[in-house]
Amino acid sequence: ATLPNLLLTWATTTSPPLITPGEGDLELTPEILAAFTQTLASHQISLTFLSGSWSPALADLIPASAPDMGMLILGAETIYSPAATEAFVEILIVLLRRVKMAKAMVGAKNYYFGVGGSVDGLKIACAAKGAVAYEIENHGVPGLEAGVGRSLVEVQMF
């Protein structure tokens, strides 16, 4: 997830909504940014963003929380090829093992034509590393059935 995507999604949940889903444009004023920051603070949410290739070195950059705390990892469009899937799952497993209660939510196309990544490939790669990955029921969500289809996959250690 990127900060702009989180901001746009948050803006659809305000009362009244600052933007309607699918609209896509939101002028970021100091007031809107302050309201977003206040919402995060009031729910005790902290965000950490990193950029780089999926690798064990990237895992070292991600701050560790206390082992008895929880962790939620969000990922999207990270499994476009079998090599990318393997690299993503490798770092995902490292992060999921850091705490007792951890899960990842991964949004992806069911199949990436021409490059070979797939949701099924993600599930197989996770199982090979001792994790379970399963698709979350999402019938009726606009846009998920169109084209090759999209899935939301939850990953946890077992």
Region roles according to the model:
Residues 1-158:
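S-adenosylmethionine-dependent methyltransferases
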